[in-house]
UniProtKB/Swiss-Prot annotation:
It comes from Schizosaccharomyces pombe (strain 972 / ATCC 24843) (Fission yeast). Its EC number is 1.4.1.2. Its main location: cytoplasm. This is Probable NAD-specific glutamate dehydrogenase. Keywords: Cytoplasm, NAD, Oxidoreductase.
Amino acid sequence: MYLTKQIPHYSRIHTTQLLTVVNHRTIPFKIRGSFSNCRRYSNFATVPLLERPFKNKSKHNTARASRPFSTQKMLLTKSHPPNMYKDSVFFGYRPIVFSGKQDQKSKVIQCLRTERKTIPDDLVEDEVDRFYNKLGLDDYYFQMEPVSIIADHIEIIYAAKIAAHASHAKEELNIHVKNENEDLAIYLDSSPVTQPELDQSSAVEESISTRYLDPFKLTDPTAYRVESFTSVTNIDRTSTENSNIYTYFVTKCDFVDNPKKDASPDVPTDIASVSDKTFLEKASDNTIEMYQDVMNSVLTRFGPVVRLFDYQGRSEIRLVVGYRRGSIFQYFPSLSKLFRYYGLHSTRTYVEQFSNGVTIISYNFKPELFKNAAVTSINELFSQITREASLLYCLPSTDFQPLFVSEKLSIQEVTYAHCVRIFCEHVMNKLGPEYSSLSAILDHSNNIHAEILETIKRRLSTLAFTRTKIHDTIMQYPGLVHTLFEQFYLEHAINHNSTPHLHRAKSATSLADEASTYSITPMSATALMDLIQKTCTNEEDVSVMEMFVKFNTHLLKTNFFQTTKVALSFRFDPSFLDSTQYKDPLYAMIMSIGNEFRGFHLRFRDVARGGIRLIKSANPEAFGLNARGLFDENYNLAKTQMLKNKDIPEGGAKGVILLGKDCQDKPELAFMKYIDSIIDLLIVNKSQPLVDKLGKPEILFMGPDENTADLVNWATIHAHRRNAPWWKSFFTGKKPTMGGIPHDKYGMTSLSVRCYVEGIYKKLNITDPSKLTKVQTGGPDGDLGSNEIKLSNEKYIAVIDGSGVLYDPAGLDRTELLRLADERKTIDHFDAGKLSPEGYRVLVKDTNLKLPNGEIVRNGTIFRNTAHLRYKADTFVPCGGRPNAININNVEQLIDDHGRPAFKYLVEGANLFITQDAKSVLEKAGVIVIRDASANKGGVTSSSLEVLASLSFDDASFKENMCVHDGKVPTFYADYVNEVKRIIQRNANLEFEAIWKGHSENKIPYTSLSNHLSTEIVKLDHDIYNYEKLWADVGFRNAVLRASIPKTLQAKIGLEKMLERIPESYLRAIFSTYLASRFVYQHVVSSDPFAFFDYISTEMKMLKDA
């Protein structure tokens, strides 16, 4: 029998509708009541503090590893006397003794008798007495609530009894009440002890978390603290069993010192200056000391802090969890569910907020649960809970939660299942043998064939194993998941000493049994597949469950069992990927999963670099589309980066982060957790070392990409705080004060673009480019766009950017364009008075705008999106715009009826602006087309040399020579930047000459030559890197390194010192890339099998002589 009432506001006089639900029938019952504002707190009567410092007897990271699942529960069935803490010595919070309780009780009786008259007069005293003295409600409740509200709650319980009697209901009486407003909320909830399925306290805690805990970030001035009390007693004298009665109090914090609005790194750490005033008044000295310890730890790490405390002279166990506010959501209710899984109920729970952004939750467990248990067994149980609390911080809830609630799987097992589901969703072979057969028949060099294959691939990937299909299959086989997780645990659990004998999580009856162990038998992949074949009912289910075996078999390391993680990360050997779908083998694959995101990091070489892209979704449909293509997009981006990085030591890599469907407003948090989880796999954690099946250290080199440019400084600082030795080189794109070389400030990407533009002019004997007309996408506000304007001298007739279109056939005013480029402003700031009579500006916000020729522009956005197809000029340099803006469906608009193209020269500065098939069409029409991977490689060259400097300097010298201080640029920094510019121009000219030569001699299309050069360099680079004899020749090796490493760097540090500091893998990459790129640029399309040997012989002689 359920009775529910919600009182919406305290300050309103009204009639409230009471709904009594009996056997699913609704009976209306009127209650008249008035509500008045109540005080947040009043003076508290306190018990003197026993001066005994708290002692942490059992550190959470020293207990033996226990079995990560439980099949039994602890049941709290003993009735607790009401207000049992009032007269005891305390170590947590000073208990409230409400001195006005008796007077208030009399007023409640008077209110019910004379005002309400809903309870028979002769029963009023008995009902009120039972409410005050038998339900175990804390005095805090009576102090916080006014007489009218207490009278309401007593009426609710009485009405429930009447309704139950009228319907002859046999179930136990349950109460569900919530009073909420902006400053205060109080919740009462109950359920029979023996019927946990009726317990709605989880729903209450989810509601509290959603409304009062989760919306507020680290620096928000608003925050709420929570106090919760649990008692066990009979609600009514006629009840046949005890009920758990939960009381929750939520109050708005009144901090001693208001929080700072900016996230300053110098946050205050003294708990007395950042606490809520109520907390300071109520907390004991021991609690303050304890919380200070937890707070200090929270402020020195990114993830949660979990501490276990017990007390001498009193068997109370206290679990304290600290974390940064706003870093996780629904954590409070998730922890409670974890405790209930083990049969634990916290008698008192406190959620405390601090103005420095720290949240601390304290759970108190009473001795009745452990009276027959050995201390080591209790420690083991809570060590287990500690590990799982850290896991819940990463993923408070998953799609497999029903298997946890029904106790078919543990929290670790459902989290494991969730991760494997995501793994399946992205990497399992969904194409089948038919696709492989078709792929073998079609010509991949034919653009039409390649596009057909790609379309079929996307369609099959969507229709085959959907997310729902994979999820439903896993839900059918919890037993298999259980077995597969055991093998995962055996291989990767931390500190189980490689033994298959793991301790079960103890139940109430087995806590005293130290000999209770659980043995896991190791199973081979073949044995697991046999079990899957026998268990699954069809081949599709086998295909899904087989991915668990691949997941386990190819996993090299994971942070799954570390307690300091903030997201889960997995480093795989990617050899399991289907070669039909992924023809070029990856070197490494990392998957990262957090509450707000999922993501991957893929690389094609040991030494590799690429940007980290964060993907947002405008709506659920877009999210589904982005999720389906996530891994393939990551793979293709890394592959493209591999070709673009042909001149530099780092191979191709890329990271992608997909924001969760409901987390589109949390990009920074997702990025931070993604980066931190990857760092877990790269550094050595001495207290909790990973099981490392790779067996060698790894370094990743990253950079900014879509939606992450503003976050790379944080990533660098965070790597430094985590004591990563490679923190200086971890990210490029950082600000100059941190040793970064900004591409936009120095025009690094534009330098290589201009080399190709000017190279074309030089080859065609164009001596005065100012007579050439030019169109540019990507405006003066962007990196490429602004620097292209500054470096060029053609006559601009059109500039198209995010704000709109600027056109003037007489030529745009160059002085005005340079002003916008210097100020990095869009073309909507262009002085329209400087346009000729035929010129115009169309902004995306414009509608029904008339152009000088009489044309009406109905929609400015549509006009902008297609403007690049309207104009004719000598030169077209895309420096921005949407991918595939020119494609096979619209490229014909750039060729007139006589076959004449709109442009003569096209240098693709923006990535992927033109599809490959469209480039082929333009080249056939006579356009000289230079593709993006060749034209814009100046940026990656600059970033690579930034990495090299970071690896070469020690920390002190790096800060002195590579970091700009107070606006003053170090002399070395300025000299190094100038050499970087020269290297960018040298590499661009080498490739341009090779492309021009290959086209002139062999009539091969320019874009095909660009692809050919990149592919050949990458292949030869790989072979040289792995050819030991060349590397073993120390004299030749050092000569190559001396020729390839910037002279400015060598002069400052010395080659010998650099060779000591730079990892050997990176030095080998410098060596192999230098030789491979120069050979291919010289020989272009040579088929002479001895050409490379002749080249090496010549290089050896020349370099050694030098």
